[in-house]
Amino acid sequence: MLIEVLKSKIHRATVTEANLNYVGSITIDEELMEAAGILENEKVQVVNINNGERFETYVIKGERGSGTICLNGAAARLVQVGDKVIIMAYCLLTMEEYKTHMPKIVFVDDNNKIVKLSNKEEHSECLC
């Protein structure tokens, strides 16, 4: 049996751009992608903290160190520049793999610079 679990997460990133006329996807700063273990073209779920929207898209690599979080195509209608989002990737694991799995969680500041890396979240933890 396989179970789907959190692989990685970029927590409370700030949307820097929304480009409606692009084909689709989310552009993420390469540094954030590497820290979270998110791959180019990987499917991700995006949750908009400001309005509650949840949607899936795929990742395009953005300029390293730029802080870019850009929603492209139709997804651009679901965010506004300045919104806070959570970007999550998932993986399928066997029960044996699950026992040792540690997700990568990247906490960022308002400029999308890394402030904390973790492998777990505590209940009620808030880095607001």
Swiss-Prot record:
<keyword id="KW-0865">Zymogen</keyword>
<feature type="binding site">
    <location>
        <position position="57"/>
    </location>
    <ligand>
        <name>substrate</name>
    </ligand>
</feature>
<dbReference type="GO" id="GO:0015940">
    <property type="term" value="P:pantothenate biosynthetic process"/>
</dbReference>
<dbReference type="InterPro" id="IPR009010">
    <property type="entry name" value="Asp_de-COase-like_dom_sf"/>
</dbReference>
<comment type="function">
    <text>Catalyzes the pyruvoyl-dependent decarboxylation of aspartate to produce beta-alanine.</text>
</comment>
<keyword id="KW-0068">Autocatalytic cleavage</keyword>
<comment type="subunit">
    <text>Heterooctamer of four alpha and four beta subunits.</text>
</comment>
<feature type="modified residue" description="Pyruvic acid (Ser)">
    <location>
        <position position="25"/>
    </location>
</feature>
<feature type="active site" description="Proton donor">
    <location>
        <position position="58"/>
    </location>
</feature>
<comment type="similarity">
    <text>Belongs to the PanD family.</text>
</comment>
<dbReference type="GO" id="GO:0005829">
    <property type="term" value="C:cytosol"/>
</dbReference>
<dbReference type="InterPro" id="IPR003190">
    <property type="entry name" value="Asp_decarbox"/>
</dbReference>
<keyword id="KW-0670">Pyruvate</keyword>
<feature type="active site" description="Schiff-base intermediate with substrate; via pyruvic acid">
    <location>
        <position position="25"/>
    </location>
</feature>
<protein>
    <recommendedName>
        <fullName>Aspartate 1-decarboxylase</fullName>
        <ecNumber>4.1.1.11</ecNumber>
    </recommendedName>
</protein>
<keyword id="KW-0210">Decarboxylase</keyword>
<keyword id="KW-0456">Lyase</keyword>
<dbReference type="GO" id="GO:0004068">
    <property type="term" value="F:aspartate 1-decarboxylase activity"/>
</dbReference>
<keyword id="KW-0566">Pantothenate biosynthesis</keyword>
<dbReference type="GO" id="GO:0006523">
    <property type="term" value="P:alanine biosynthetic process"/>
</dbReference>
<comment type="pathway">
    <text>Cofactor biosynthesis; (R)-pantothenate biosynthesis; beta-alanine from L-aspartate: step 1/1.</text>
</comment>
<dbReference type="Pfam" id="PF02261">
    <property type="entry name" value="Asp_decarbox"/>
</dbReference>
<keyword id="KW-0704">Schiff base</keyword>
<keyword id="KW-0963">Cytoplasm</keyword>
<feature type="binding site">
    <location>
        <begin position="73"/>
        <end position="75"/>
    </location>
    <ligand>
        <name>substrate</name>
    </ligand>
</feature>
